[in-house]
Amino acid sequence: MKHMTFVQWAVWLGFIYPVCSCQPRPDLKLWYTRPAERWEETLPLGNGRLGMMPDGGVVQETIVLNDITMWSGSFQDTRNPEALKYLPEIRRLLLEGKNDEAQELMYKHFACGGQGSAFGQGANAPYGAFQLLGNLHLQYHFPDSSDVGYSAYERGLSLDKALAWTCFRKGKVKYRREYFVSQTEDVMIMKLTADRKGMLDFDVAIDRPENYTCYANDGVVYMEGQLDNGKGKAGTKYMVQLKVWTADGRQVADSACIHVKEATTAYVLVSAGTSLWAADYPERVEKLMQIAGNMDYGYLLERHDSAWRYKYNRVELDLGTPQDILPTDQRLARFQEQEDPGLVALYFQYGRYLLISGTRENSFPLNLQGLWANSEIGRASCRERV
């Protein structure tokens, strides 16, 4: 290939520049026409500290909640200074092509000095494990029987807005739900609407598999607990606050649940924190809830959107006209037989989306499952790896 001169490069860039800058940016999204059937199909939202994954269920919906500091176990010294002595021999074996022998030497002498991660079962070991924060359960009650089918179902995730949604029609009413984890106010937010007055009835509760207590106080549901430190003592403490605001309708909170009846619009806010880095985590959780609770939903969304776009809009990738008239799962299946460059661009941007959603300044790095986990023992304890 001939070398291009600076002028030739400039002319070539001049031809492609209008294509890159003047074409309307496509709305990058994942979307589906059915609820998620397993956790891996849910849609990840996060701000680097908090995460949520809604499954978009129609009658019963579960949203998995996460906090990047929700770790069991305890600090331990895992240094192994003796390993250094075997490094020259390992290098020699590698240079001689004796990879298997080098690997065996690594296995034998390059183990950590502590007790290790309990072979990926570290929830109650000193190493610990990254665990889910909790499960948010929503039970919806419709004016027609719950057996009545639904139509026009869609759930999706906008990469450009870091906003997920679920919408469908049931009977004569159209319902819509929006979810996001605020980049600025550091809380998890959900908006539920019905297009007919007073047709929104639901119960919302929170729990987790173990180590938790729930109670209600002044209309707010609290979940608190403490994880195992792996040494027979109490470890990381945590607190979750759940609160609902309604523009109309009625609501009442009992020990672990908030009941909403005859509403048209409702807002669900979740604030959370742990003691891993902050001894005053209860005060912080309370303050975050108060600040967000005093803001209008539109203003919360606007601030979140602005902060998100500042990070996300730094990179564009245009590989041609996107074929997003098909749901994402159908595009993926068709991709095996038919080219779809737009899906490749979407995949690239989804990777960026996950990195931005899962990290933030002065927080933990992404672990094996990013910021998201749906059990108390994730894959290989959800360790960070290089």
Describe the residue ranges of each PLM region.
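Bacterial Sec-dependent signal peptides at the C-terminal "C-region" and cleavage site
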Residues: 3-7, 15-26
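Aromatic-residue-lined binding/catalytic grooves and analogous aromatic/hydrophobic interfacial grooves
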Residues: 24-383
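Acidic, Ala/Val/Gly-enriched low-complexity intrinsically disordered segments
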Residues: 10-11, 386
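N-terminal low-complexity segments that are often proline-rich with Ser/Thr-Pro
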Residues: 4, 384-386
